Amino acid sequence: MSKRYFVTGTDTEVGKTVASCALLQAAKAAGYRTAGYKPVASGSEKTPEGLRNSDALALQRNSSLQLDYATVNPYTFAEPTSPHIISAQEGRSIESSVMSSGLRALEQQADWVLVEGAGGWFTPLSDTFTFADWVTQEQLPVILVVGVKLGCINHAMLTAQAIQHAGLTLAGWVANDVTPPGKRHAEYMTTLTRMIPAPLLGESPWLAENPENAATGKYINLALL
């Protein structure tokens, strides 16, 4: 049976993809057949092959399996906005059954599957359904990515409590340095480590350019999952 994890963040732009790539690299190094999955992505570029999202492409590159883009990212939208807004505008409903069937297909090929969300925990996929609802439906263990910056402690605790309130397992968390470490960085890390009810899997350092392409798997302790 495949190991499956869902990666969420304390907000958008906190480094979910950077952390996801690091986790995929670590799992590959541990000998797993890995697959990254970004079921819904907004903010994509037009290419000769169609719309392509940079986060989904990074997951595709960092998977040990050779996966088609549509397998990694079944729902792709051009505008970088909440999925429920752009899907309604385009008349393309996001179906949880499609998201789930995509996950099942990857589980048949890989023994370690990482699913990356969009935005934060409660990102809406429609007027009545959120990413959190789908993760709860799938009963996926959750890995929380915390962008270490001012305000992150409150955001981390709110998200962790919401995950646990849904009855899900908070399997671990990853710290992502979204800026060069400030003078309170060590104190933020100490507080987060004490207050988040899950193990710290690793800390991705500040990287100014293309962090999702860097060899960051070495910063992850996969044995804690």
UniProtKB/Swiss-Prot annotation:
Q: Which keywords does this chain's UniProt record carry?
A: ATP-binding, Biotin biosynthesis, Cytoplasm, Ligase, Magnesium, Metal-binding, Nucleotide-binding
Name the Pfam families on file: AAA_26 (PF13500)
| Lineage, uppermost ranks | Bacteria, Pseudomonadati, Pseudomonadota, Gammaproteobacteria, Enterobacterales
Q: What does this protein do?
A: Catalyzes a mechanistically unusual reaction, the ATP-dependent insertion of CO2 between the N7 and N8 nitrogen atoms of 7,8-diaminopelargonic acid (DAPA, also called 7,8-diammoniononanoate) to form a ureido ring.
User: Per its Swiss-Prot or TrEMBL entry, what cofactor is needed?
Assistant: Mg(2+)
Q: What is its EC number?
A: 6.3.3.3
Q: Quote a single Gene Ontology cellular component term.
A: cytosol
> Which residues are involved in binding ATP?
13-18, 55, 116-119, 176-177, 205-207, 212
Q: Which family does it belong to?
A: Belongs to the dethiobiotin synthetase family.
What is the protein name for this chain? ATP-dependent dethiobiotin synthetase BioD 1
Q: Write out the catalytic residues in the record.
A: 38
Residues annotated as binding Mg(2+): 17, 55, 116
List this protein's GO terms for biological process. Answer: biotin biosynthetic process
What are the coiled-coil residue ranges? Answer: none
Q: Please state what class of enzyme this protein is.
A: ligase
Q: Does the keyword Transmembrane helix apply?
A: no
Report the locations given in the UniProt record: Cytoplasm
MF-aspect GO terms? ATP binding; dethiobiotin synthase activity; magnesium ion binding
**Organism of provenance:** Escherichia coli O157:H7
Pathway(s) this gene product operates in, as recorded in its UniProt entry: Cofactor biosynthesis; biotin biosynthesis; biotin from 7,8-diaminononanoate: step 1/2
Sites where the protein binds substrate = 42
Subunit-level organization: Homodimer.
Reaction it catalyzes: (7R,8S)-7,8-diammoniononanoate + CO2 + ATP = (4R,5S)-dethiobiotin + ADP + phosphate + 3 H(+)
